[in-house]
């Protein structure tokens, strides 16, 4: 007899042709694609996949965690194979396992990590996985900016203007730029994120690097004290969860 089990999935996807993670009224989403496969496999409409976080349109993931409770007597290898056989080639369930019934992908995720990739050399093969940024990088200024981000701040100036989230306070545990010849990547670890937050941070730090804003101005943005500066949003293609 089938038993209700809590299934954990670790999912990798190329977000280029998705309108983000969350199901929408129209358009292709990662959640929608996987839930469609699950409905087909388990012959039920009672499917509700919970993710550790929601990625925006065009954003990728190397290890998106999700869970769902299902009535099943299938083993995890069978489920993994069935899901991957019913979804597109730009999304893949890497790990599939049964976990404690109390596990919740969103609430159990205390720290979430994002990486943003930039390069100074355009590549047709990598154009959807990194931002080709052709301005010179001031590495010292970028390091100073990233150091300022660590800690607890009000990120009201670094999120989508229409965001209706009550609290815009986030705690940043790690914020660091890494460089290798003409390439770079920015790593951030936080307890939570606001919509477009990482992309606004990356874009605005690069504006400081170009000399368009000062460190003092950037710092004032972190304290939600400067409405005169236009924050710049980096494109989605360089961002990975």
Residue ranges and their predicted role:
Residues 1-241:
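Structured-RNA-binding interfaces characteristic of tRNA pseudouridine synthases
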